[in-house]
Amino acid sequence: MLEKEEIVSPNLEELKSHYHSIITLLGEDAGREGLLKTPERVAKAMLSLTKGYHMDPHEVLRSAKFQEEYSQMVIVKDIDFFSLCEHHMLPFYGKAHVAYIPNGYITGLSKIARVVDIFSHRLQVQERMTLQIKDCIQETLNPLGVMVVVEAKHMCMQMRGVEKQNSITTTSDFTGAFNQAKTREEFMNLIQHGRV
C-alpha cells in the first residue's frame, strides 16, 4: 500500500476552483454549508487517487532486488487495489495476482504489491494496468517469466450505462515460461485453490 502522506500540489487551488464550478454547473449551491469544503476535499482526493503518476515502479523493484538462486514460481496473490476508469473517472476495484519465475534475482514481496498500487493510482483501463504491471516486473527483474491476472468490478458498469452490479472483469497477460499452458495452469490452480 502506498504511504498516506498529505498530498501537496501546485495545482490544488486550480483544481478546487474547477470542482467549485462543476458543483455550480450541476445546479447546486457550492456555497451551502454541506458543500463549502467539498471542492478542496475532492481536489485532494483526486491528487491522492492519481499519485502513481509521480512514482517510479521500476525504482521500487530495484530498491529491493536481491541475487538469489531460487528458480521456482513466486506468487503474490489477492493484492487489493482500486483505480479510476479513465473513461468516466469512476472507481474500479478488485484483486491482482502476480507471479514470476526468478532468473537469478528476486524482489521484496511487498514491492510487487507496491507496483500494483502505483499503476492503479492513475487514470486507467484494466487491460493496460495488467500489461504495465507485467512489463515493469519483466523489464526490472528479467525473470524467466511473469504472469498477471486482475479481477475487478467497475462502477462505470454498475452505476451507469448497462447497470450490471454483479459483473466481474478478468484480464491476464504473461511472458516467457508462462507461454507454456502447463505453467499457466499451475499458476491459476495456485491462485484459486492454494489458500493458507
Curated annotation (Swiss-Prot):
Keywords associated with the record: GTP-binding, Hydrolase, Metal-binding, Nucleotide-binding, One-carbon metabolism, Zinc
The EC number(s) this enzyme carries: 3.5.4.16
Keyword check for Zinc: yes
One GO molecular-function entry: GTP cyclohydrolase I activity
Domain of life: Bacteria
Top-level EC class: hydrolase
Protein name: GTP cyclohydrolase 1
Gene Ontology cellular component terms for the protein in this record: cytoplasm
Gene3D superfamilies in the record: 1.10.286.10, 3.30.1130.10
Similarity comment: Belongs to the GTP cyclohydrolase I family.
Annotated positions binding Zn(2+): C85, H88, C156
A biological process term (GO) from this entry: tetrahydrobiopterin biosynthetic process
Coiled coil: none
InterPro entries: GTP-CH-I_C/QueF (IPR043133), GTP-CH-I_N (IPR043134), GTP_CycHdrlase_I (IPR001474), GTP_CycHdrlase_I_CS (IPR018234), GTP_CycHdrlase_I_dom (IPR020602)
Entries under PANTHER family matching the protein: GTP CYCLOHYDROLASE 1, GTP CYCLOHYDROLASE I
Keyword Zinc: yes
PROSITE patterns according to UniProt: GTP_CYCLOHYDROL_1_1 (PS00859), GTP_CYCLOHYDROL_1_2 (PS00860)
Catalysed reaction equations from the record: GTP + H2O = 7,8-dihydroneopterin 3'-triphosphate + formate + H(+)
Known partners and oligomeric status: Toroid-shaped homodecamer, composed of two pentamers of five dimers.
Pathway the protein contributes to: Cofactor biosynthesis; 7,8-dihydroneopterin triphosphate biosynthesis; 7,8-dihydroneopterin triphosphate from GTP: step 1/1
